[in-house]
Amino acid sequence: MTTNTTNPWVRTHTEVLDQRALPMPAAWQATQVNRLPTLEVGRSIHISGNQGALRDELITLLNQAVDMAVVCSFLIADPAIEAALKVTAERGVRVYVMLASEARLGSEPNQGEFDQKTHAQHKAMLKTLGKSVLFRTAAHFHAKVVLVDPYTRPAGVLLTANLTQEALTRNEELAVRLSPTQVEGIAGYLRWAMWQTAEHELLDGHDFKAAKLVSSVQHPTPQGEICATTMKHRGIAKQLQQALKNASSHIIVSSFGWDVQHPVVQQLCQRAREGLKVTVLARVRTAAMPALLALAESGAQVYGFKWLHAKALWTDAGDAMVMSANLEAHGLDDSFELGALLDVRQAEELKVRLEHWQNIAPWHLLPAPTLGDLSGEVQLWRNGQLNRVQVLTEAEVNLGEVVAQSAHQLETPRPGVSNPSQSDDPAHQLKCCWTATAPYSHPKASPQMRPAQGNEKPQPYSPKVLREPDGRLTIAITQPSELNAAVQLLGEMGAAAIVIDRGQRP
């Protein structure tokens, strides 16, 4: 559209661009769904949440201990759990706690899982409980379980959550109420890891010292209801690969960590390419993007969360597991990790939990969207970083002023616009506005005279004809009424353009 202005030498243009078909980088699209409440403690599959029900379940478990309580967590930073451990120990119950080493903890904040406040709480907990609880630590301790009386009245819970306040009340986390057989099996792994692989122990509540190994403790024989990753066994990875192979139509998988090069992730991609419905739940993290993009490009539906930390697998073939291991080498190939295999009823309960999260997921990964696929809040994957942008339905941009080729043709092509893939506020419909102005005469142009006939003096052209330093001819006018004559003269002289006499410049 063209609009005339009060200035005869200026014309305003507008053009609406439909940019919806333009390609965009891979993007997390906000889903705008409401987070629906749900029961945190189920029949045997629990989730964390702001009700604190999972934490209460763990405290109840510790309170029922008579002879022994064994806890394994990357770290502990929850006042209620700390108090329950203290009370349990003061009742005369032997309390064993397995944690990651202090050296490992020192590097973890850079990975974004724990903040400095959580570390401070953890260190304070060590001082408080160090004289009544036996702590053994190792860099590879990553399993998360709470067991009580494993050899007399076995009960326990396997978690994906570390025993921190944030993990138990904020994150998307899972926990499994273990059967007596599973408790006994896990106790065997914990016993071996504690006495054979621990690096340090805290006996006096003050200083960690090198741990003495107990050579008589043997690595347990793998059994059917639990899986583990140890320096001698890769049971979790093997179980995952077999479960993925068994699946015939549907797979749901959740993890915090992802490695695109790991065989398990490669197998997931392959099953998606084969046409299986693969649903992926993950935390939105830069480090995970290569794997999550590979999954999405293979056909998986990938859903993102701010705090998800749960690790689990469900398939339509009946295989299901909740585990501490991430889908990467440190977790499936090394480290100390534990997983619980689920029976049919538990598997169905896990599926319900995972589908609930899918339905309330705040983000959905689109591997190759067009701009029209995106709206509202979006995280674009650009140059190895996630950038938050707002995709608008429509927007207006002023493209500035363009000097026309000639005063009698104030129609100018639209100036270029920025690529929406690089914009922080791309719009489906972009209304572009710009002004076209008539060119002015060259400041060093010289007037040209009509050829003289006979003894007549050369006369100027009307309108004026100017020759620019490079030889280009132009017709100079001062007012719109001269345009018709200028156009005629333009043709006669073979001039390049009609310009406005510089003396008329405002």
Predicted regions mapped to residue ranges:
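Terminal interaction modules at protein C-ends
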Residues: 3, 175, 252-261, 351, ...
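Extracellular and analogous surface-interaction loops
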Residues: 244
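HKD-type phospholipase D/PLD-like phosphodiesterase module
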Residues: 7-64, 72-240, 263, 270, ...
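A generic alpha-helix structural signal
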Residues: 62, 187-190, 351-354, 403, ...
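Long, C-terminal catalytic modules of enzymes
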Residues: 319, 325-388
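An anion/phosphate-binding loop that grips the pyrophosphate of nucleotide cofactors and donors
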Residues: 65, 247
